[in-house]
Amino acid sequence: MAGEDRVEQESSVPADVREKHALLAEQIEEHRFRYYVKDQPVVSDADFDRQLRSLEALEEEHPSLRTPDSPTQKVAGPYRTEFTSVEHRERMLSLDNAFDDEELAAWADRVAKDVGTPDHHFLCELKVDGLAVNLTYEHGRLTRAATRGDGRTGEDITPNVRTIAEIPHRLKGEDIPALVEIRGEVFFPMEDFEELNARLVAADDKPFANPRNAAAGSLRQKDPKVTATRPLHMVVHGIGAHEGLSIDRLSAAYDLLHTWGLPTARHNKVVDSLAGVREFIAHYGENRHSVEHEIDGVVVKLDEIPLQGRLGSTSRAPRWAIAWKYAPEEVNTKLVNIRVGVGRTGRVTPYAQVEPVEVAGSEVEFATLHNQNVVKAKGVLIGDTVVIRKAGEVIPEILGPVVDLRDGTEKAFEMPTHCPECGTELRPMKEADIDLRCPNARTCPAQLRERVFYLAGRKSLDIDHFGYVAAAALTRPLEPAEPVLKDESDLFSLTVEQLLPIRAYVLDQDSGLPKRDPKTGEEKIATVFANQQGEPKKNAVAMLEGIAAAKDAPLARVLTGLSIRHVGPVAAQELARQFRSIERIDEATEEELAAADGVGPTIAASVKQWFAEDWHREIVRKWREAGVRMADEGSDEDEGPRPLEGLTVVVTGTLAGHTRDGAKEALQALGAKVAGSVSKKTAFVVVGDNPGSKYDKAMQLKVPVLDEDGFAILLEQGPERAKEAALPVPEAAPAADPENSGE
């Protein structure tokens, strides 16, 4: 009877009073949450008390509004996530996978056959590598968030999900359905992952093995205040149960989610054929690291919702969708050892030797660890099972250990005190430096090998057929006993007769260790430059021709190749432009160097320190005698116009008419600064094929974007005409589309 009385009493409360009560209750709950969980109150205590008293007054006047769920009946205090089991109104299904084109084509054929009409489309989405979450909105208000669980039942994580800034507590706009379940993926950005693990290790807590585990662990905190400190993000990619919502196309549904204020992604595409699907998959296979989160594949869905219903589902997955999986970029393997390598400037860097494993389509045996502090911050021990990641062309890296698999035999890494190749005691260059360095720059074989390899490389003299094996053979051969190159000064005096007798280990570029024969396990040794008849190999002849051609290299490339600390291609370009010859750079005071545009005191000091060494001067002397051009032609007055002086330009994508380096050099020659990221200070963004996220950022910031024709106008006619040729900027950002985890 009491329940019936309450219903009768509630029905007697005017609608506007009930609405005012509901709004006040929601606002008070939100203020409590911001105060106790996020430590970000947006109202004063007095304003909060005033709202609470208003709610109490309404309930005093209308007692039927005073329910156990009312803020007036609950004690305010710390929130706690209990992880109680909750049932999804509509099942969260998984997805079937396609690992090759044959499986993808077979699925597309089945779809075409079952829908019975050629008039259908595919919606291609990126597959986010995160944790699947189901959001329930009732009358536009977020009432529950739950994990996927077994698809039918998940865990209630509402207080934790409410800490994610991107997830609206109330949907925007009109025509909000009475009920809607929103499916999406919570992820942990890679750039924040290492920082979190370092904090955990410093606090003697277990580190996470990878960003996905970090996202899951962050959502499973009993105290939402902890979750609130984690930089979690979400993208939505589907709709579950709903009332009062009618829509025919999934792509249109995503546009609707965006208008409601939900975090959707921008990389989806509707195509009308399998060829379009393949093109989308290929594009993001090459550009998967240009998006703002980790992806491990592409989800392909039938876009027409009525046709989805016709195809139905199996017990675990819809027949109208499939997940194309890229080769995995994260795998588990054993950390066999931690070694150290010596770079061209003497920096000693730890690296991981792991049991060989296939990652992202290639075999990996070594991974970077940067420095001893990173080893400590990652919490890895020799003997650990670790998660290794290889992202595109990036050097493989260790993400973290799988702590639960430790058996007690693991041991900590200790940084060596002496150089592993020359035995010199290691020390930091300055007292506060993290890195240890080998100070034996002249005779340390590792430093010489790395400097010579860099000198011949694409950023420096760009000598054909002069790779890592050649650099190692010339600087530390097995035969003859003495190296042909004792330092860089010998480079331009090399002869074919010197090359022929050289035998050396075939070294691995990642580790500096000899490669091994896969059949015998023995270290590989080769006669590097001569064939079996004792005649010079074609690559040896080509290498000597490349060395001769490098004598005419621009001054900037010569400066880059000298491995002066802090002088990379950009600084070398500025030094060459402003001083014109190596003699004038040598003669300039530190103050004169520091005053030059783009140089500054750090580079200036490093340049003067380099020229203070007699053996460095000997390199310059012998190169000059060999005919190396040590000055750019012309005087300062002859330099020519610099119409792009002071402008910052970003180049992205593949240009048909220029290499990336060629485009940069053309811009720098006209005075432009070439940057790697887009900001409000960017003057132009030059885009080729597959430009990635920099194009999107430029459009968002309304930075002029030039295609190849526009780039030619910029170089030939200047910035004002180039602005006229810029690609049109949309009035508003394109409608966002969601990512998909393929639960």
Swiss-Prot record:
Keywords: DNA damage, DNA repair, DNA replication, Ligase, Magnesium, Manganese, Metal-binding, NAD, Zinc. Residues 725-743 have a biased composition (Low complexity). The lineage of its organism: Bacteria, Bacillati, Actinomycetota, Actinomycetes, Kitasatosporales. Its EC number is 6.5.1.2. The active site is at K127 (n6-amp-lysine intermediate). Residues 639-728 form the BRCT domain. SMART domains: BRCT, LIGANc. GO terms for cellular component: cytosol. Zn(2+) binds at C419, C422, C438, C444. NCBIfam families: dnlj, PRK07956.1. Signal peptide: none annotated. One of its GO terms (molecular function) is DNA ligase (NAD+) activity. CDD domains: BRCT_DNA_ligase_like (cd17748), LIGANc (cd00114). This is DNA ligase 2. It catalyses: NAD(+) + (deoxyribonucleotide)n-3'-hydroxyl + 5'-phospho-(deoxyribonucleotide)m = (deoxyribonucleotide)n+m + AMP + beta-nicotinamide D-nucleotide. GO terms for biological process: DNA repair; DNA replication. Belongs to the NAD-dependent DNA ligase family. LigA subfamily. DNA ligase that catalyzes the formation of phosphodiester linkages between 5'-phosphoryl and 3'-hydroxyl groups in double-stranded DNA using NAD as a coenzyme and as the energy source for the reaction. It is essential for DNA replication and repair of damaged DNA. NAD(+) binds at D45, A46, D47, F48, D49, S94, L95, E125, R148, E185, K301, K325. Residues 720-743 are annotated as: Disordered. Its cofactor is Mg(2+); Mn(2+).
